[in-house]
């Protein structure tokens, strides 16, 4: 192995040949031991140079005859990082690879590369498959690590990090994050030295505008920016809103261009390079006015054209969805958030970190002296909500005016979600071959970020992990603070008179120590909306947002557990939607008992894990495969499980689309238009279909379902042939 000085010299030489010299946080990272193998976490604003810190770690790994992985949350971002690194380093002999999606592939072909840029999920898939070259990894860069707090994929990322650290003893981790709350807590868990910076290359001013006319207010902000020779990005809740607003603004923006500027833009759009790019007539029309919309429904080439024209200044305005928020390198003078509500749920506000990731794009280095991040509120009440939710405020000593200072959320683990625990129990068992519940809880999952945070959080419940059998007491411990449980065991919380006890409801009157009386109930009955009624208490706050039950319900639950035994063990977990991860996997036939009290994956369980299927998806496949008798029912099954995996709603138009893709010679872009799909969505659906058809084939073969196996393999072969011949030229 090369000495530290040799490594530093070689990495510095590579950077110099690429025309770069470390500065700012990059120099800080080197001083902190980056080129000596020290793991580093960088927490700093957009545009501060975080990416190069990761690249230096990867170059260090390569000079030490190791491989490097660069992990990102989105395929589009993976392509962007790949192209940048390929342009910088491949001519120096550093081989750069790209791998996204393709969960059915083994990844063995990636062994030829020194550095692989990929997504979290693809890396997780490779690790589950135990790809042969993974032991040779020396450095892993995890970009946008704040994704850890996302439901579902955050738990998968957390598990991936745990398993990488367990598998690779000398692994160097470089974690990159936008500014977040309590970054030291995350850095400590990762084993990283923290480099934190709040300095921005361009100063950013925040504003909240209260208006009864959102569209007009946005128009004024955009036009002021464009007329000042600046650029603007407007974030919208939905694709439809982004497209509609781009069309609405097109003529106004277009009038700000000179004849010469318009001519150059027209020439660019009509050039041979762009002639065959899949752009809708609507997008081409607005692009000719120097404005565009940007979302995941566009094909890759369409997004690339929009991004390139914006970076060159030929497009002045982008109306976007959140696809631009997650790491895409597109700063603008003015960034406008048109609505604070979540795209998936209008009742939910966007998270603080998500909002500041969007607004943090304001201010383009070398072009702007200042950036503006603006939130549009529909009323004074909404403006007050935006201010209290997303900002602190202070008085500027120079101007004596109020200035808004961003608030940032700490990153919370989502591994404790029941669905995530169930999946990760199977993942860990496949990794270990066999283990007891206690070995997993105290071992590999005991090293999780979930436990790391719980140990340091006074608000954490007494029991964080419960993988095995559940009872009324274990469930209460998952929803109560330690001191509450201890007081309950000593009968210090009050006394209970049980009034209701049946297979759906346990209820009674709880008299607290101060003499107050409360009507409490654990109800497993379904409401008219089809949801479990859950815990109820006349105190008005039966359960907090963090899942902590009130003292009165804990008192009722402990009394019921003592007096009613198995009835309480049945009703209380149901009322709180708690299940045993191990019990659930056993019922599905994914794990089974082994020797010495251990459990292990079945053949079906190992296949499920390595196919990268979620537990809800495999449950549906196993239930519906016996009823899949022809192509129509197979397409229905495929549509159903795609909806589960992606969280989207599909109807029969998907069946018609896929059937026509396979059987006709009509270009895919034309079929997308015919059946009402965006071209970007179609290629995503095809990719997902290829993976899930492969999964169906594997599970059908395991179940000796010859007919389904033939159907799924036939459909997969036809789809693969058509896709390979007609895939959009995205490379």
Protein language model regions, located:
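Conserved segment of the helicase C-terminal RecA-like domain
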Residues: 171, 330, 334-337, 341-343, ...
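Conserved SF1/SF2 helicase motif Ia
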Residues: 57-81, 167-170
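Conserved interdomain linker/interface between the two RecA-like ATPase lobes of SF2 helicase motors
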Residues: 162, 172-253, 285-296, 379
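Long, low-complexity, compositionally biased intrinsically disordered regions
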Residues: 453, 457-573
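SF2 helicase catalytic motif II
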Residues: 116, 120-124, 130-173
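C-terminal helical accessory/scaffold domains
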Residues: 427, 435, 566, 570-731
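Conserved C-terminal RecA-like helicase domain
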Residues: 69-70, 79-82, 86-97, 240-317, ...
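Conserved pre-motif I regulatory segment
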Residues: 2-43
């Amino acid at each position: 192995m090369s000495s530290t000085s040799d490594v530093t010299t070689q990495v510095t030489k590579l950077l110099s040949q690429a025309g770069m010299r470390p500065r700012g946080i990059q120099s800080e990272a080197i001083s902190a031991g980056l080129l000596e193998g020290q793991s580093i976490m960088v927490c700093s604003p957009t545009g501060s140079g975080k990416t190069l810190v990761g690249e230096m770690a990867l170059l260090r790994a390569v000079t030490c005859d190791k491989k490097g992985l660069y992990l990102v949350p989105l395929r589009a971002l993976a392509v962007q990082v790949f192209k940048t690194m390929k342009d910088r380093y491949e001519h120096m002999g550093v081989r750069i690879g790209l791998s996204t999606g393709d969960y059915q592939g083994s990844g063995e072909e990636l062994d030829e590369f020194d550095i692989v840029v990929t997504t979290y999920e693809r890396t997780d898939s490779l690790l589950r498959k135990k790809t042969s070259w993974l032991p040779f990894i020396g450095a892993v860069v995890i970009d946008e690590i704040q994704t850890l707090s996302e439901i579902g994929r955050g738990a998968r990322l957390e598990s991936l990090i745990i398993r990488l650290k367990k598998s690779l003893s000398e692994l160097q981790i470089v974690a990159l994050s936008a500014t977040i709350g309590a970054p030291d807590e995350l850095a400590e868990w990762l084993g990283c030295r923290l480099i934190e910076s709040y300095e921005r290359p361009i100063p950013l001013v925040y504003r909240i505008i209260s208006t009864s006319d959102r569209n007009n207010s946005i128009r004024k902000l955009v036009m002021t920016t464009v007329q000042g020779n600046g650029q603007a990005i407007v974030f919208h809740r939905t694709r439809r809103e982004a497209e509609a607003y781009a069309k609405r603004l097109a003529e106004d923006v277009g009038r700000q261009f000179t004849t010469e500027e318009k001519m150059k833009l027209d020439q660019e759009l009509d050039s041979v390079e762009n002639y065959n790019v899949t752009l809708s007539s609507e997008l081409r029309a607005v692009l000719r006015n120097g404005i565009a919309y940007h979302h995941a429904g566009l094909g890759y080439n369409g997004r690339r054209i929009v991004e390139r024209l914006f970076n060159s200044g030929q497009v002045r305005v982008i109306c976007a969805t959140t696809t631009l928020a997650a790491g895409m390198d597109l700063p603008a003078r003015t960034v406008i958030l048109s609505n604070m509500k979540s795209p998936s749920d209008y009742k939910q506000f966007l998270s603080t970190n998500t909002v500041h990731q969007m607004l943090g794009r304001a201010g383009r280095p070398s072009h702007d002296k200042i950036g503006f991040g603006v939130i549009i509120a529909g009323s004074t009440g909404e403006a007050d909500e935006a201010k209290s939710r997303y900002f602190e405020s202070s008085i500027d000593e120079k101007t004596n005016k109020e200035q808004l200072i961003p608030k940032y959320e700490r990153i919370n683990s989502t591994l404790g979600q029941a669905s995530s625990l169930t999946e990760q129990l199977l993942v860990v068992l496949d990794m270990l071959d066999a283990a007891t519940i206690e070995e997993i809880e105290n071992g590999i999952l005991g090293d999780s970020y979930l436990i790391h945070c719980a140990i340091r959080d006074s608000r954490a419940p007494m029991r964080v992990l419960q993988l095995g059998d559940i009872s009324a007491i274990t469930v209460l411990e998952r929803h109560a603070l330690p001191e509450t449980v201890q007081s309950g065991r000593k009968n210090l919380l009050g006394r209970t008179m049980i009034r209701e006890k049946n297979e759906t409801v346990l209820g009674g009157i709880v008299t607290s120590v101060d003499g107050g009386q409360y009507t409490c109930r654990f109800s497993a009955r379904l409401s008219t909306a089809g949801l479990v009624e859950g815990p109820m208490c006349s105190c008005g706050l039966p359960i907090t947002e963090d899942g902590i039950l009130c003292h009165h319900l804990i008192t009722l639950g402990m009394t019921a557990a003592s007096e009613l035994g198995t009835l309480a063990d049945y009703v209380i977990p149901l009322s709180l939607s708690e299940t045993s991860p191990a019990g659930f996997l056993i019922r599905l036939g994914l794990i089974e008992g082994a020797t010495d009290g251990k459990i292990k994956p079945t053949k079906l369980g190992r296949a499920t894990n390595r196919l990268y299927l979620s537990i809800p998806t495999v449950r549906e496949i196993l239930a519906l495969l016996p009823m899949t008798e022809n192509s129509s029912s197979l397409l229905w099954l495929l549509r159903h499980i795609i909806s589960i995996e992606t969280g989207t709603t599909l109807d029969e138009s998907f069946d018609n689309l896929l059937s026509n893709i396979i059987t006709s010679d009509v270009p895919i872009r034309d079929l997308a238009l015919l059946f009402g799909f965006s071209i970007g969505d179609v290629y995503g659906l095809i990719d997902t279909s290829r993976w899930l058809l492969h999964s169906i084939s594997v599970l059908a073969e395991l179940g000796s379902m010859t007919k389904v196996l033939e159907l799924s393999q036939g459909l997969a072969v036809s789809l693969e042939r058509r896709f390979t011949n007609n895939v959009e030229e995205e490379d």
